[in-house]
From Swiss-Prot:
The keyword Cytoplasm applies. Residues 138-203 form the Tudor domain. It comes from the Eukaryota. Residues 332-346, 413-443, 617-634 have a biased composition (Polar residues). Tudor domain specifically binds peptides with symmetrically dimethylated arginines (sDMA) and may facilitate protein-protein interactions. This is Hypersensitive to pore-forming toxin protein 40. Keywords: Cytoplasm. It is found in: Cytoplasm, Perinuclear region. Its main location: cytoplasm. Residues 332-351, 413-448, 472-492, 617-672 are annotated as: Disordered.
Length: 782
C-alpha cells in the first residue's frame, strides 16, 4: 500500500465516522482499517479504556493529504506478548528479578525477566538469515508489532514499536520510532531504515523475556498518571548499574483472563513504600481489582516473605445464601385481604406514626366513589388488622372530632354511627378493598380540582378534598346542593386529619370566578404549507428553519464542505427569486446537529401555539379562530417548488388571490384591535412602536390613517415577503406574551438575516421597520 492508497482509505474511513457521529469499536474494523486508524493519530483518536476510535473534528480536503503519525502503543496491541506471558512456566507465588521497561494504558507494565535467558540459537539464526530481511514500507509500521533491528556490523535484535519519535514531516526512511528490545534490557529510538521484517523469528516460535504485568490491586490507572509513571521508570532505567542489577518483584499469580502477571515491587523513587501503595497514595488508580489478594507491606517485600494471601470483600457466587429461618415469637393475626402491602415492622403499634402514615397513604390512593359510607375505622381495618376495641376507640374519637369541626346534626351523627356498628364491621372491611387506580390518575384529578371554578366556590368540600383527597372531582361535575352530600363529604375526614380542625378555623376564600358555558373551539384546518416550510425535526413550526440558518451563519459551520465537497457556485444576489429560494428551500438536514434539543422544542412549541379570540368568545360566538402563526404555514412565495424525498420536481405551489375569499382559509387575525402593520398603544408593553414623535402623534390621533399610508407606501413590494414579515412579527409578539426569550431572540435574528438578503430597497425598509417594532417588545422581559 503506497501513500496515496493509504490516504484514500483514511479519508474514506474518516468520512464514514463523521457521518456516523458515534465512536467505532476496534473489533468492528477489518485488519486494514485497524492499521489505518493506528497510523493516523492526526485524524483518529483512540480510547484505550473503551477500545474504540473516534474522528477528530477537523476540516479535511481530499486534495490535501494529511501526514500520518503512529499512535502510542496500547494494551490492545500486545496480543503476541500476552500469549508469551501466558506460557511462562515459573512457580507462583514467588520472587523473580525484573526490570520495568514501560507503562501503558489501561494498565500494563512491560517488565523484563532477568532470570529468563534468550533462546540459544536465536542470534546465530538471525545472522544467517539477514540476507532475506527487507525494509518495511512506512505504511506497514504499526504500534505493538515486532520488527528486527539490524546494526551496521550485522548484529540483529528483535524489538516492538512503542511510539513514533521525532518530526513526521520528514522522508519515510528518516522517521524515528521508540522501540523496546524483547531479548535484552534496552529502549532506544531507531530510524525506519534500520528496521527489517521477516517471516521467521516470531515470538511464538522463539519465546522472549519481555512480559506483560500489572500491579496488584489495580486494574487501570488514570490517563494523566501514566506519563509520571513512565518518568519514574526512565529515571530507574537510566542508571546502568540499576538496569543490569534489576530488582526483586513478588509474583502473586497469573491472571488467565487478562494474560498478565500480577506483581508488586518496591517504589522506584526509593521511598519505603511498595508500588501499589505509592499509586494508591497518589490516587493514580482509576479501577481497583477487587479479586486480587491484599498486597504485601514494604517490610515483607524486603524480607522476601511469602505469606498466606488475604482477600477483602471476597464473595463467592457459588456460596450458600444465609436465610433467616428463625420463627418469630409474636403471633400475627390473619390480615384482611387488601391491595396495600403490609409490613410487620410497621404493625407494632396502630397508633404509631408509621401506621398512621401508611393508613393515610392508602386513603389517598382510594378512588372517591369507593369511600362513600366508610368511616375511618373501616378504612383503618382494611389496611391492617386491628382489634375491635381499638376500632371502637378510633370511632368514638372520630365522631367527637367531626361533631366539633363540622357542626353535623345529631340524626346524621347517629346514622353514621350505625354504619360502623360491630355487626356490620366485617362486611365493611370485606368491601372496602377496591382496586387502587394508578397514581397518575389521582394527580390529574387533583390538578383539575384545584384549577376548576367549582372547587374555588365550594370551599368546605375543597378543604375536605385537600386534606383527605377523597372529594376530587372533574371540572364539569355539578356542585353539591343538598345538605346530606355535604355531611357525607365531611364524614370522610379521617381521625388524625379531623382532629387538627376546630370550629374557629376560617376557610380561606378565593375571588369568585364566573361560570361560563362556552368551550374554546379547536381549529381543525389542515396545514397547507409546502414540505420545505415544515420543521425538519417533525414539528410544523417554520421558525426552526430560520433559527437553524441563523445559528449556522453565526458559527460559520459548513458541514457540506467538511470532506472537500464544494458547494455549487451561487447565482447573482440581485435575483429576488433565487435569493428567496436559497434562503428558504435549502435542505436543512445538514445543519440539524447544530440545534440544541431545548431550542428545537421551545421554538416549535411557541410558533404553533393556538390563541383563541377572546372578544369572539365573550360574545358567545363559536366560530373557530386561528393562531397568528397559522398564517406562516399558509404563506408561500410564488417561485417555490415542492420536491419529494428523492428530489424529484413536483407541482409548484402558488397563491391564488381568490383563496382569500374562502372563509375556511384564515390567514390573519380578524381582531380589529390588533393591527399587523403597526403595533398600537394597546400592545402588551404599553409602548408605541413608532420611531419619531411625529409618528407617535399620528398613532394617538388616528392609527388607521397612519396604517393606510404605510400600506400605500409599500404597495409595490412583494406580497410574499410582506406577509412573511408580518407573520414573523406576530411570532415575536407571541414569544413576548409567553415570556419565551429564546424564541423571541431567534425570530428577531431571523428577521435581520432576511432583511439583509432581500434585494430591493423598499423591501429592506419594510423589513427594518418591522424589526424596529419587534425590538421594542423586548421591554416585556424587563
Amino acid at each position: 500500500m503506497n501513500s496515496q492508497q493509504e490516504w484514500e482509505h483514511a479519508y474514506s474511513l474518516a468520512e464514514r465516522m463523521y457521518n456516523k457521529q458515534a465512536p467505532t469499536k476496534r473489533e468492528e474494523l477489518n485488519p486494514t482499517e485497524r492499521v489505518i486508524c493506528s497510523r493516523f493519530e492526526t485524524i483518529f483518536d483512540y480510547d484505550p479504556f473503551k477500545d474504540e476510535y473516534t474522528f477528530r473534528d477537523q476540516a479535511l480536503l481530499f486534495s490535501t493529504p494529511v501526514q500520518p503519525k503512529c499512535r502510542t502503543v496500547a494494551e490492545a496491541d500486545l496480543h503476541e506478548l500476552k500469549e508469551n506471558t501466558a506460557k511462562l512456566n515459573i512457580p507462583m507465588p514467588s520472587y523473580i528479578n525484573i526490570c520495568p521497561i514501560y507503562a501503558l494504558l489501561p494498565f500494563t507494565v512491560l517488565v523484563f525477566n532477568n532470570s529468563q535467558h534468550a533462546h540459544k540459537s536465536l542470534s546465530d539464526d538471525m545472522e544467517r538469515a539477514a540476507a532475506t530481511f527487507r525494509n518495511p514500507h512506512e505504511s506497514e509500521i504499526v504500534p505493538g508489532a515486532m520488527y528486527i533491528f539490524k546494526q551496521k556490523h550485522g548484529k540483529a535484535y528483535r524489538c516492538i514499536i512503542l511510539s513514533e519519535d521525532g518530526d513526521m514531516n520528514i522522508p519515510d526512511a528518516e522517521r524515528k520510532y521508540l522501540v523496546a528490545f524483547i531479548d535484552n534490557v534496552q529502549i532506544v529510538s531507531v530510524k525506519q531504515k534500520t528496521l527489517f521484517v521477516s517471516d521467521q523469528f516470531s515470538i511464538k516460535d522463539y519465546p522472549c523475556a519481555l512480559h506483560c504485568a500489572r500491579i496488584v490491586g489495580i486494574s487501570a490507572i488514570r490517563k494523566s498518571y501514566v506519563s509520571g509513571m513512565n518518568q519514574f521508570i526512565l529515571n530507574f532505567y537510566d542508571a546502568k548499574e540499576k538496569r543490569k542489577a534489576g530488582m526483586f518483584a513478588f509474583i502473586y499469580k497469573l491472571d488467565k483472563e487478562e494474560k498478565k502477571l500480577v506483581i508488586d515491587y518496591p517504589s522506584l523513587l526509593g521511598t519505603p513504600k511498595t508500588t501499589s501503595t505509592e499509586i494508591r497514595t497518589a490516587v493514580g488508580h482509576q479501577i481497583v481489582a477487587s479479586k486480587d489478594p491484599v498486597s504485601l507491606t514494604f517490610e515483607q517485600l524486603n524480607k522476601k516473605e511469602v505469606p498466606e494471601f488475604k482477600y477483602l470483600n471476597s464473595t463467592d457466587d457459588d456460596s450458600d445464601v444465609e436465610l433467616d429461618l428463625i420463627e418469630h415469637d409474636t403471633k400475627s393475626v390473619n390480615p384482611v385481604a387488601s391491595s396495600h402491602p403490609t409490613s410487620s415492622s410497621m404493625d407494632d403499634c396502630p397508633y404509631g406514626r408509621a401506621s398512621i402514615a401508611r393508613a393515610k397513604d392508602y386513603q389517598l390512593r382510594l378512588p372517591p366513589h369507593s369511600q362513600k359510607g366508610l368511616s375511618s375505622s373501616s378504612l383503618l381495618g382494611s389496611s391492617y388488622p386491628v382489634s375491635n376495641s381499638i376500632k371502637n376507640d378510633i370511632t368514638k374519637q372520630s365522631e367527637s372530632n367531626r361533631a366539633d369541626a363540622t357542626n353535623i346534626s345529631f340524626s346524621s351523627f347517629e346514622s353514621t354511627k350505625s354504619d360502623i356498628s360491630p355487626q356490620n364491621n366485617q362486611n365493611v372491611e370485606e368491601t372496602s378493598t377496591p382496586t387502587v387506580p394508578p397514581n397518575s390518575t389521582i394527580q390529574e384529578n387533583e390538578e383539575d380540582e384545584i384549577m376548576s371554578p367549582a372547587s374555588i366556590i365550594r370551599a368546605p368540600s375543597r378543604l375536605a378534598g385537600s386534606l383527605n383527597k377523597v372529594s376530587i372531582e372533574r371540572p364539569n361535575t355539578p356542585l353539591p346542593t343538598s345538605s346530606k352530600n355535604s355531611e357525607h363529604n365531611m364524614s370522610e375526614i379521617s381521625t388524625y386529619e379531623a382532629s387538627s380542625i376546630s370550629s374557629h378555623h376560617l376557610v380561606p376564600q378565593s375571588p369568585s370566578v364566573p361560570k361560563t358555558n362556552y368551550t374554546v373551539p379547536v381549529v381543525q384546518r389542515p396545514l397547507t404549507a409546502p414540505e420545505k416550510f415544515r420543521d425538519p425535526f417533525g414539528g410544523p413550526g417554520s421558525s426552526d428553519i430560520l433559527n437553524t440558518k441563523m445559528l449556522c451563519s453565526e458559527k460559520n459551520i459548513v458541514p457540506s464542505n467538511k470532506f472537500g465537497r464544494q458547494i455549487s457556485p451561487g447565482k447573482d444576489d440581485k435575483n429576488e427569486n433565487y435569493q428567496y429560494s436559497r434562503m428558504e428551500t435549502k435542505p436543512q438536514t445538514l445543519f440539524a446537529p447544530v440545534l440544541d434539543e431545548n431550542q428545537r422544542q421551545s421554538s416549535s412549541s411557541n410558533m404553533m401555539c393556538q390563541i383563541p379570540d377572546i372578544s369572539s368568545v365573550a360574545q358567545g360566538s363559536n366560530a373557530p379562530k386561528t393562531a397568528p402563526n397559522d398564517s406562516v404555514n399558509s404563506v408561500a412565495p410564488d417561485d417555490i417548488h415542492e420536491t419529494d424525498k428523492r428530489g424529484n420536481h413536483c407541482k409548484s405551489v402558488t397563491e391564488d388571490p381568490k383563496d382569500n375569499k374562502d372563509p375556511t382559509a384564515v390567514t390573519t387575525l380578524e381582531d380589529p384591535d390588533i393591527n399587523d402593520e403597526n403595533f398600537s398603544v394597546q400592545s402588551i408593553c404599553s409602548e408605541t412602536f413608532v420611531e419619531t414623535d411625529q409618528k407617535l402623534m399620528e398613532v394617538e390621533t388616528g392609527a388607521d390613517a397612519f396604517t393606510e399610508s404605510i400600506t400605500d407606501q409599500f404597495a409595490q413590494m412583494s406580497e410574499g415577503l410582506k406577509k412573511l414579515a408580518i407573520n414573523l412579527a406576530d411570532s415575536v409578539r407571541t414569544a413576548a406574551i409567553e415570556k419565551n426569550h429564546d424564541a423571541f431572540i431567534a425570530n428577531i435574528h431571523a428577521m435581520e438575516i432576511i432583511s439583509k438578503k432581500v434585494p430591493d430597497d423598499i423591501d429592506k425598509r419594510f423589513w427594518k421597520m418591522k424589526i424596529v417594532e419587534a425590538r421594542k417588545l423586548e421591554a416585556a422581559f424587563d
